[in-house]
């Protein structure tokens, strides 16, 4: 069974915003020399929103699209209540940039053998450099990290449907391979 562990989404919440003023008003740390965005944290749902002076907001840490929307709504309402001019939040203007999914195959995997059986030009396995097998899927465009424990990380999907398709594709690939008990 797969599980979404992170979603990254972006949207425009205003034309531009003075992050120093936001920092002073909301008592949020902002160090432009360190990072050009301000980190706005929401407790429930637990997400971080990177707010840039251009008015762009990038949500990280969400586990669902609903959490993305709720986190943005909380921030926009907070800023509006403190006198900042914000645009109305529209769901269709929120763009999912990346979804990270984990999957546990449940069996130990021999990555050396697996790398020989999977499509050569889509697979990288160099255990001296990285302990997992890297498997690239063309459609939907995504990258899978497969570990000998049977645990997998799938990243690069732009929708929950794509994440499920990529997981299904990886599962099909793994199910055609023999399992190994070490």
Where are the regions that the model predicts?
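Intrinsically disordered, low-complexity polar/charged tails and linkers
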Residues: 1-143, 149-151, 157-182
């Amino acid at each position: 069974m797969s599980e979404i562990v992170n979603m990254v989404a972006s949207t425009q919440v205003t034309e531009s915003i003075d992050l120093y003023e936001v920092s002073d008003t909301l008592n949020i740390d902002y160090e432009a020399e360190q990072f050009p965005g301000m980190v706005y944290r929401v407790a429930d749902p637990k997400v971080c929103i990177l707010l840039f002076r251009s008015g762009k907001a990038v949500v990280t840490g969400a586990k669902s699209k609903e959490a993305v929307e709720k986190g943005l709504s909380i921030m926009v309402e907070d800023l509006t209540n403190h006198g900042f001019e914000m645009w109305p939040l529209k769901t269709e203007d929120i763009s999912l940039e990346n979804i990270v999914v984990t999957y546990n195959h449940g069996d130990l995997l021999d990555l050396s053998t697996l790398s020989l059986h999977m499509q050569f030009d889509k697979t990288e396995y160099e255990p001296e450099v990285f302990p997992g097998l890297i498997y690239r899927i063309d459609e939907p465009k995504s990258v899978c990290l497969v570990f000998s424990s049977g645990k997998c990380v799938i990243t690069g999907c732009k929708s929950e449907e794509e994440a499920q398709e990529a997981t299904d594709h990886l599962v099909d690939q793994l199910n055609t391979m023999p399992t190994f008990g070490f």
